[in-house]
């Protein structure tokens, strides 16, 4: 099977082979609250989103753990553009503020409600690798994320990682379940 992600650059796009989705370049939403007082300029973010979409972009990356991100994305994107004109990826966090499996479901429901949408296009386990991997295993996040897709709350599932190749290899040791 060909790699799921193709190179990114001028005139190229990421391609998800199984879904035929093409993404010219993603729009990261982690730092919307960059002001000293942690407020967000919704008009400025709306303008940024409009420029990005006019240039052909449609993929927005957020996470439950990003302060103000989902709330801002709802106001600047969801309430202003048709749902079929964009893709939203969000992430579950098993290693922070998670004390039981039910916390993962609560995160998901909060994400959907805050964004004001019924489903995510992509749902990822956030920042897999290193010591965080144990939390994903402890709360059975692999099965949880799989169930999110099975319930129609996400079209695609996966993980994100900010770790060394060795840590990522360890996260996929033989006893890890593939989803």
Give each language-model segment a name.
Residues 2-86, 150:
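N-terminal binding-site loop/beta-alpha segment at the start of enzyme catalytic domains
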Residues 27-29, 62, 90, 122-125, ...:
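Conserved beta-strand positions
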Residues 32, 65, 94, 117, ...:
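Flexible cofactor-recognition loop at the NAD(P)H-binding site
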Residues 36, 40, 50, 98-179:
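Glycine/proline-rich, positively charged
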Residues 84-96, 123-126:
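A short, structured active-site edge motif that brings together acidic residues
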């Amino acid at each position: 099977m060909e790699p799921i992600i193709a190179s990114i650059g001028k005139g190229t796009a990421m391609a998800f082979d199984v879904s035929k989705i093409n993404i010219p370049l993603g729009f990261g939403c982690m730092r919307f609250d960059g002001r000293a007082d942690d407020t967000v300029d919704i008009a400025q973010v709306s303008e940024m989103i409009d420029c990005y979409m006019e240039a052909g972009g449609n993929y927005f990356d957020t996470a439950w753990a990003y302060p103000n991100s989902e709330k801002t994305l709802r106001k600047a994107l969801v309430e202003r553009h048709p749902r079929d004109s964009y893709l939203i990826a969000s992430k579950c966090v098993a290693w922070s503020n998670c004390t039981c499996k039910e916390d993962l479901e609560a995160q998901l429901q909060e994400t959907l409600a805050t964004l004001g949408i019924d489903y995510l296009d992509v749902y990822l386990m956030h920042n897999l690798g290193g010591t965080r991997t144990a939390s994903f295993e402890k709360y059975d996040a692999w099965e949880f994320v799989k169930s999110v897709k099975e319930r129609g709350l996400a079209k695609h599932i996966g993980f994100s990682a900010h770790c060394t190749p060795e840590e990522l290899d360890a996260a996929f040791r033989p006893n890890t379940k593939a989803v």
